[in-house]
């Protein structure tokens, strides 16, 4: 993935809103853009085969 563990932490340690796909802080409970309550953790693995 990323070259450095620091970069990987910064890029992948996020939550994604299930409604508007906004990136949120890992400690967020609601979306910062739309206020939606359902957030998922960003995938650590790429979707490609």
Swiss-Prot record:
Keywords: Ribonucleoprotein, Ribosomal protein. It holds the Pfam family Ribosomal_L40e. GO terms for biological process: translation. InterPro entries: Ribosomal_eL40_arc, Ribosomal_eL40_dom, Ribosomal_eL40_sf, Ribosomal_zn-bd. Disulfide bonds: none annotated. It comes from the Archaea. The keyword Glycoprotein does not apply. Signal peptide: none annotated. GO terms for cellular component: ribonucleoprotein complex; ribosome. GO terms for molecular function: structural constituent of ribosome. The keyword Cytoplasm does not apply. SMART domains: Ribosomal_L40e. Belongs to the eukaryotic ribosomal protein eL40 family. PANTHER family: 50S RIBOSOMAL PROTEIN L40E, LARGE RIBOSOMAL SUBUNIT PROTEIN EL40. This is Large ribosomal subunit protein eL40. It comes from Methanosarcina acetivorans (strain ATCC 35395 / DSM 2834 / JCM 12185 / C2A).
């Amino acid at each position: 993935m990323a070259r450095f563990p620091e970069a990987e932490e910064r890029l992948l340690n996020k939550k994604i809103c299930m409604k508007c796909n906004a990136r949120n802080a890992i400690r967020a409970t609601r979306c910062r853009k739309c206020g939606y309550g359902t957030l998922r953790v960003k995938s650590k693995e790429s979707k490609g085969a």
